[in-house]
């Protein structure tokens, strides 16, 4: 995948959050260096997803794979390190925003266009998504029919890692003071998320 400014910025952001958490947990300094080196190697192999709305999630997937290849810890422990590092970052909280901004009706037109574009499947590893209309049960609904993180994990020979990144959505929703309800994930064998 191309190392665009966006990809490099997101990579640096995740790395700084995880690096700080590794330090808090007493890891050796070379662990963070090994993670970023491995992450760069994975991103160089990763299939292009263009200017996807979910490029930060794709980069997160690569970074998590790199952690699992570099720390000597279990996927669960690496998930906790990643989660705690992000939650401790004030910048992350600021960037995520809140429920009001995320659910703004002004964003619906862009979401619908994104959904339509995703169905063209221009990039093999990008997500394919349907936006669900507001109803009595929820303010915003998504059906992800294809998942870029699952595809990246499959390409890297570690499909079992995708499920840990699915859990990160609950962390993000909590940070934004939203409630996330999920009926299944592709990573766990469901037809869609």
Ranges and model annotations:
Residues 1-69:
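N-terminal, charged low-complexity regulatory/assembly segments
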Residues 28, 74-77, 159, 179:
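Short coil/loop linkers at secondary-structure junctions
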Residues 59-65, 69-155:
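Amphipathic interaction/junction segments at domain boundaries or subunit interfaces
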Residues 123, 188-189:
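A short catalytic or substrate-binding loop motif that flags glycine-/basic-rich loops and adjacent residues
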Residues 130-188:
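Short, hydrophobic/π-rich interface segment
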Residues 192:
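A short beta-strand signature within small-molecule sensing/ligand-binding domains used
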